[in-house]
Amino acid sequence: MADQSLSTEEYPTEIHEYLMAFENSVGSVDEMLKKMMSVSRSELLQKIEPLEQAKLDLVSAYTLNSLFWIYLTTQGINPKEHPVKEELERIRGYMNRVKEITDRKKAARLDKGAARRFIKHALCDPTSEEAPPAKMDCKAKKKRK
């Protein structure tokens, strides 16, 4: 912390534990931001696909606004009444849209050719009234007609 001269006896132990956890979290965020800032943005964007670029931009914007939310809280300002709340909601909306697009890409796709063959062979019924002998397949049945 900034002022190490305060002893833990001057404030409750619970607060000290929370402050230490907060300090560790801020340190982790700082390390991540340093890693992210060490690579140039244009270099990074060249290596990833457009959808991944959108995800990166959204996560960056969300992280920055979340940090600002924390800053406002530490300054005694209610962030729920600040425009940052609307910005976070807007970013969440875009994140949901990107998630929908990602889910659509991952969804099973219909192979029309395979479906057509499957239906064609499933509908071939050699036991119908006009059916050829049981050992004949559907192709032979078509040739007979």
Curated annotation (Swiss-Prot):
Secretion signal span: none
Pfam families xref list: Sas10_Utp3
Sorted UniProt keywords: Coiled coil, Cytoplasm, DNA-binding, Exosome, Nucleus, RNA-binding, rRNA processing
Gene Ontology biological process terms, A to Z: maturation of 5.8S rRNA; regulation of gene expression
GO CC terms in record: cytoplasm; exosome (RNase complex); nucleolus
Coiled coil segments of this chain: 84-109
Domain of life: Eukaryota
Location in or out of the cell: Nucleus; Cytoplasm; Nucleus, Nucleolus
Gene Ontology MF term list: DNA binding; RNA binding
Role this protein plays: Plays a role in the recruitment of the exosome to pre-rRNA to mediate the 3'-5' end processing of the 5.8S rRNA.
Subunit structure: Monomer and homodimer. Associates with the RNA exosome complex.
Entry's family note: Belongs to the C1D family.
Record protein name field: Nuclear nucleic acid-binding protein C1D
